[in-house]
Amino acid sequence: MANDQVILLDYWPSMFGMRTKMALAEKGVKYEYKETDPWVKTPLLIEMNPIHKKIPVLIHNGKPICESLIQLEYIDEVWSDASPILPSDPYQKSRARFWAEFIDKKFYDPSWKVWATMGEEHAAVKKELLEHFKTLETELGDKPYYGGEVFGYLDIALMGYYSWFKAMEKFGEFSIETEFPILTTWTKRCLERESVVKALADSDRIIEYVYVLRKKFGAA
């Protein structure tokens, strides 16, 4: 694997790309990072992801792997000699996949709509977002990590969103630390890992980016 060529097409605010960077760091994989603005469909992005034309795209020896959750599994299988990401137990693995899908299918929409909407729609979105935060906190329970004692797949899946938490709080007018103390303790534990810290974007910079997006989409 020492001679492998690994390239990551990503955009700095992408929570999905942050996941992939965490996984690569956990495995100690060296890679070339190529900043790729998703609003500008570069020839390389179109070539590597012709169906969706979205980032992140992981390119391993010229072969593209799309979708962040798929990338996590790919990274875990290819670089299997260090820091397992997915549980080995089939049942626990299925649960991790279930909850990761919950994050992207249920949590994702209100996580950005909370800063992109106003009025009654905003109130409904905020309510939905808080319910999903509570669901995720309940699933965590008293475990150090979502997979138990070991940092892994589901932790990476949710921590990818961490850089956006502050924007969610600001525009949603709520406090994660106050309303979800167990989840807050978990985030602090995850932030002790170098792989996580180095993968995350600056939260204040994300807020500045949100203002740009609000203006772009007429939500300012």
From Swiss-Prot:
One of its GO terms (cellular component) is cytosol. It comes from the Eukaryota. GO terms for molecular function: glutathione transferase activity. It is an enzyme of class 2 (transferase). Gene3D superfamilies: 1.20.1050.10, Glutaredoxin. Keywords: Cytoplasm, Detoxification, Stress response, Transferase. It is found in: Cytoplasm, Cytosol. It holds the Pfam family GST_C_2. Its EC number is 2.5.1.18. Its main location: cytoplasm. Signal peptide: none annotated. Induction: By alachlor, metolachlor and benoxacor. Residues 4-83 form the GST N-terminal domain. SUPFAM superfamilies: GST C-terminal domain-like, Thioredoxin-like. GO terms for biological process: glutathione metabolic process; response to cold; response to herbicide; toxin catabolic process. Residues 89-210 form the GST C-terminal domain. The keyword Metal-binding does not apply. The keyword Transferase applies. In vitro, possesses glutathione S-transferase activity toward 1-chloro-2,4-dinitrobenzene (CDNB). May be involved in the conjugation of reduced glutathione to a wide number of exogenous and endogenous hydrophobic electrophiles and have a detoxification role against certain herbicides. Belongs to the GST superfamily. Tau family. This is Glutathione S-transferase U26.
